[in-house]
Amino acid sequence: PISFDPLRVGVTPDVELVTHPVLDLLLSPNLEVRVVLARLGALRITGEYGVSLPTFAMRLTQGYLFPTWKTSDNRVGWILVPSSGIAVSYGERTVLTGRLEVAAGIPLGHNDAKPLDSWAPLELLLAPALTGFRSHVMLGVDHPFLPWLRGRASLDFWRIGPSEPTRSPLFFGGSAALDLKTSERTTLTLGAVVYDYDQHRTEVVRGDDGRWQRKRVRNVDVWPMIDFVYRR
């Protein structure tokens, strides 16, 4: 997916505010606070606390992602999504990072929206609101090759809440990217993201007894990653 780096505002050396004002502020108001909890040499521990309100985006996409419900009393309800996480990073030049994050959807009234059964990035984005829960574990590495070139990679694991019809709640992913410094204030990121997940896909295969039968298989999708970062 083409992505846009969030706006980061340093309040103090240990406190940072993060939001996506261009893409999300009007559609899904969001804010994350990152607080450095401890520094021990090259080790840093950071707490991450956020909240978002995805209802505007969900209502805007009625007729595409969700039913319009023009002739019924069904509706996309108000849903608040708080999140909490912790990140542990180590290293000065090559940085290793581990992150654990949990988000939950809190309905503020009646809601009829159901899980989308769609592409993995969209499923994971709205999982707290539509399934009630999303947890995420990430292991990553960031290494500079040249003064103007950095490489980074990650392994990811997600678990979301239950949905109907029943499917596996487990998502696996990985990413690799190169950050190219194009000027003193700009960076271009090029890479790819892969997802392994259950989308109710089936294939007809021949069993050991010679009979043909349908078997559930997981989807594996690869998405390009393009990002442009501007720093003031």
Question: Where do the PLM segments sit?
Answer:
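Transmembrane beta-strand segments that form the barrel wall of outer-membrane beta-barrel proteins
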Residues: 1-3, 10-25, 29-33, 45-53, ...
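Residues that act as N-cap/strand-start positions at coil-to-secondary-structure junctions
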Residues: 2-3, 82, 135, 172
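Short, charged beta->alpha transition segments
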Residues: 3-6, 85-87
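Outer-membrane beta-barrel strand-turn architecture
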Residues: 11-13, 37-41, 90-96, 143-149, ...
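Outer-membrane pore/translocation modules
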Residues: 22-134, 138, 194, 203-230
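Transmembrane beta-strand segments of outer-membrane beta-barrel domains in Gram-negative
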Residues: 122-126, 132-145, 154-160, 179
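Predominantly the C-terminal beta-signal and adjacent terminal strand-loop region
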Residues: 157-232
